[in-house]
Amino acid sequence: MGRTIRFGVSLDSELLDKFDVLCDERCYQTRSEAIRDLIRNTLVQQEWEDTDREIAGTLTLVYDHHKSDLAQRLTEIQHDVHDIIITSLHVHLDHYNCLEVLVLKGPGQQVRNLAQRLISTKGVKHGKLSLTTTGQDLT
């Protein structure tokens, strides 16, 4: 981590008031911590746009495992790209519905493509990809 540099920011008073409320709601002790997080989030979002850059994330899927061969099809897709799946968790929500959570890491485009393949598989009730950074370029 580099040295800390102090700099000034000019804001409209109403915008600052709203920012202070946000800081309080999210339990930031200082405005500086909140601003650092905003900058980091912007940098991470920029990473996601780079299709070749390595990213990490989770993919959650909810599906009825009684649907004909759905679990088998999902497993086959996962085996096709096992190198970007770090781990998976399978939870039985009730007699019919399962929650599957995949932890992913790999080139951005490959991660997004896998997520789309799984989410769009017939029988998947809901799917959500949540992306983050590998942290390598953040301080």
Curated annotation (Swiss-Prot):
Annotated cofactor note: Binds 1 nickel ion per subunit.
Source organism (scientific name): Nitratidesulfovibrio vulgaris (strain ATCC 29579 / DSM 644 / CCUG 34227 / NCIMB 8303 / VKM B-1760 / Hildenborough)
Keywords from the named record: DNA-binding, Metal-binding, Nickel, Transcription, Transcription regulation
GO molecular function list: DNA binding; DNA-binding transcription factor activity; nickel cation binding
Transcription regulation among keywords: yes
Protein task: Transcriptional regulator.
The protein, known as: Putative nickel-responsive regulator
CDD domains to which the protein is assigned, alphabetical: RHH_NikR_HicB-like
Origin organism lineage: Bacteria, Pseudomonadati, Thermodesulfobacteriota, Desulfovibrionia, Desulfovibrionales
PANTHER family: NICKEL-RESPONSIVE REGULATOR (PTHR34719:SF2)
Cofactor: Ni(2+)
Biological process according to GO: response to nickel cation
Gene3D superfamilies, sorted: ACT-like. Chain A, domain 2, Met repressor-like
Entry keyword Transcription: yes
NCBIfam families: PRK00630.1 (NF001884), PRK01002.1 (NF002169), PRK02967.1 (NF002815), PRK04460.1 (NF003381)
